[in-house]
Amino acid sequence: MGQKVNPIGLRLGINRTWDSRWFANTNEYGQLLHEDLKIRTYIENELKQAAISKVVIERPHKKCRVTIHSARPGLIIGKKGADIEKLRRKITQMTNAETHLNIVEVRKPEIDARLIAQSIAQQLERRVAFRRAMKRAVQSAMRLGAEGIRINCTGRLGGAEIARIEWYREGRVPLHTLRADIDYGTAEAKTAYGVCGVKVWVFKGEILEHDPMASERRAVEGAGDGGGQRRRENA
């Protein structure tokens, strides 16, 4: 079972928490869900170069709080905060609610599964050899503290006539162990031969306390190791 399902979804409520954190009545749920999808799509399209790891959306009473985890926060904030203000106004128009934006820096993008997948996809689009891109990502992750990593690439790799799957694994990636802190990310590479898919699993150790926020708290503590979490709030 653990081999097939999304490892983040399998661990929700155990050591992972949701990226959308709000409660809604039945008649409001659909509208708010579509707003979340629009916000995430807009941010990912508008900030392609900002290395977005994830977008967390919270909705206190008649407000919307959006937290963007990025490896390049400077690209989001812009000169004197001009870009982040423009982004805040756009999200306010989408939600018709008072919007607060927080930017959290990802201090170790080499062990963030989503950012690894995006990096490999970009290299495939630039015609870098897929084996070289995968090996480089595996070596960087293991060097920076990951306990295990697995990378899958699928599609017409290297322009081959027949699509296939290539994968590399180093260290342990215990997908069945629910206490394992496993990060998972996907990306698509739009190449001249067609679309290639990239999946990445990163094992960061075991979380022994039963706490849905434990994984996020560990990420924040890791960010603090490099001189404090970089964070900007825009009301």
Curated annotation (Swiss-Prot):
Gene3D superfamilies linked to this entry: 3.30.300.20, Ribosomal protein S3, C-terminal domain (3.30.1140.32)
GO biological process: translation
SMART domains reported in the protein's UniProt record: KH
Top-level taxon of the source organism: Bacteria
GO CC annotations on file: cytosolic small ribosomal subunit
GO molecular-function term, one example from the UniProt record: structural constituent of ribosome
Keyword field: Ribonucleoprotein, Ribosomal protein, RNA-binding, rRNA-binding
Stored Pfam families: KH_2, Ribosomal_S3_C
Stretch list, region Disordered: 215-235
KH type-2 domain sequence ranges: 39-107
Function according to Swiss-Prot or TrEMBL: Binds the lower part of the 30S subunit head. Binds mRNA in the 70S ribosome, positioning it for translation.
Classification via PANTHER family: 30S/40S RIBOSOMAL PROTEIN S3, SMALL RIBOSOMAL SUBUNIT PROTEIN US3C
Self-association state and partner proteins as the record states: Part of the 30S ribosomal subunit. Forms a tight complex with proteins S10 and S14.
Family, per entry: Belongs to the universal ribosomal protein uS3 family.
Name of the protein in question: Small ribosomal subunit protein uS3
